[in-house]
Amino acid sequence: MADYGTYLGNGAYLGPDYTAQALHVYLQGMYRYYAKTLYGKSFNKLTTLQQEGIKGKVKEEIRVNRYNAKDKELTLTKAQTAGYQYLLKYYRKAFINNPKQVGLPDNMIKNRTNEYMVKGNKVDQLTAFFFWGAWLSSTNRLGRSYSYTNNWPYDLEAGNVMTPKAMTWTGISVALLVMGVAIAIWVQKKYNFESKAQYQKDVPIIEPDTLPITTSQRKTAKYFALVMVLFLVQILLGELMAHYYVENTFFGIALQNIWPFNLAHSWHLQLVIFWVATTWLGAGIYIVPRVLRREPVRQGILVDVLFWALIFVVGGSMLGEWLTDLGVLNKNWWLFGNRGWEYLELGKFWQYLLIAAMVLWIVMLMRGFVPAMRRKDNQPRTRLVTMLFLGAIAVPAFYCASIFIMPDSHVTFADYWRWWIVHLWVEGIFEAFAVILTGWLLVDMKLTTIKSTIRALYFQLILLLGSGVVGTGHHYFWMGDHSLWLALGASFSALEIVPLSLLVWEAYTHYRVYQDTYHNFPYKTTFIFLMWTGIWNTLGAGALGFLINAPAINYFEHGTQWTAAHAHGSMAGVYGMFSIAIILYVLRNVTVKEFWTAKMEKAIRWSAWLLNIGLAGMVFATLMPVGQLQLADALKYGYWHARQMSFYHEKLISLILWGRMPWDLIFTAGVIILLVVCWKALFHLKKADNQAAAAEYERFAAAETKSQVNEIDE
């Protein structure tokens, strides 16, 4: 259900938040109990004074913690028991007697008992889990005046209001942001932590049209063709999900029985991880002969093995998720099917295979990077290569945090590790690897000096990882963890904006390179997307991230469409645009000169505009306005109300959601153009010549080393 609705605010956004909804229904059941017990009437027949008296009594009653930690026993009052019974009836009707759930097939929940399950009615067991969320979100921690979730979700009838800590640390985080930006800019300028332009100098320039390539480099092209196929499928699934917000079927076709919303959501998230990661793999493989200055023995065979391993993992995991969601795969569902955790839906078997594939990639990199790191002839280049290799190792290393999540893991502990993947791995390690890889590209294309680039990378990585690691805590505000995370998460997530703000200047630098380099500079299409990467890093990851991460806003916003706006702006805007830049760089080097006609480069420029106009429309013309109205609804009626399906069916909301279609189509057109480019590139590849490539790389390295004698390290 986390790929349909949310629990503790985490999950997908079409369905309700089951914590908030269960809390609201649970309270209604208690009201009914006291109305009948005290007055012998239904609650809605009571006077306003009588109703308010019952609400006050219930609010006091649910705040009392009756859990016995020694005996591990929770005692409910008679009214709470009545509320729980009312909750059971509610969900039996919602999931069984009244099965029409938007975007889901009828009677989706089956009473089957498999691994990690206990016997009994599955709807009732699910209800018990929802009730537990309602209880921990409305019952005070022992010795505290706020609940286990720091009084989230917002619900006045439950006594859930924002704690003073949330407001206090929001103010402090804003002050830290202002101070952090000022200090970072001062340090950057004072100690010259910027990449120095080098393209004006008389230095050796790589000419991709005459550059020989090796066998393994030639084979990377198919990785990028696969990337574009996965990218296209991913956005089509996203558009199907967007359509489910406005009607249950797809223009009258009952696709929800074949591709329900939760399956589309699972695939949508998995595919973005797969295609971005595949881009990293392809880029790393291309770089190996460049740093080693020759082709490693039988490297091409390993490239093929890794490629087909990726297809097996992607196809197998998606099939397993499909069969699980349709109720076909039941036995060993957690190994081969859908485990239900957002971004980690793939079964354990596929997860281990993915880790194994990334380890194979590291082995392939080691064959080139380790010998290169031992060289003494060019120390600055060696340091840059070492940074890139360590960044690559971090990609599979930090993904291993996902193996700690098992089907019987406590939700708070499991979500703790899940955010290591969603935030620390995707937003942290991916970002760090992207920053280092960008530096390597700038140096490799002789646009910046090595020494200045290394200094700039050290500075950026210290800021990025120094704030980002602890900044993961802003995901722990309301999930049952310690209130200490309100302070740590608010402070460090604000500081995360500092390095992202500096990327505005990086974006301008890329634009300047694009404008100022000589007319026949071969990588201008790459720099178009690098420029957009910097812009979206500031807008999507930076501005929108800070907007929703401040505790005082996140308390009401958590799990609304503003979260989706941030996710699209950062994931598609940053990693999407950067991945495309990497793809275009490699393709420019491995394809023949005749492929890069003026018409081809014009098509890529069109693609860049279509992608960014479409993405901006999705984020700022649809998700942000809907999120703002949703936030207003939560403030007025309570969080549970803003997450009901009825909210999306309001006339204005429905109109805005229908208005997303043109932006989706524009974005799709941009992807299709890139798909055509990548597939055409497969038929215009250079012939591999390992000996010629080795000779050229040695010549280039010698010329580079000589040029560094005159490089001034300012």
Please place each PLM-identified region on the residue numbering.
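Membrane-entry segments of alpha-helical transmembrane domains in multi-pass membrane proteins
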Residues: 1, 29, 115-180, 213-233, ...
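Soluble extramembrane regions of membrane proteins in the secretory/endomembrane system
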Residues: 1-165
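Hydrophobic or amphipathic alpha-helical targeting/insertion segments
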Residues: 3-7, 12-48, 290-291, 297-365
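Juxtamembrane membrane-water interface segments of multi-pass membrane proteins
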Residues: 185-195, 202-222, 243-256, 260, ...
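Hydrophobic alpha-helical membrane-insertion segments
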Residues: 227-238, 306-320, 393-395, 533-538, ...
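Hydrophobic membrane-spanning alpha-helices of multi-pass integral membrane proteins
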Residues: 390-398, 431, 456-472, 498, ...
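Short, intrinsically disordered terminal tails adjacent to the first/last structured region
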Residues: 695-714
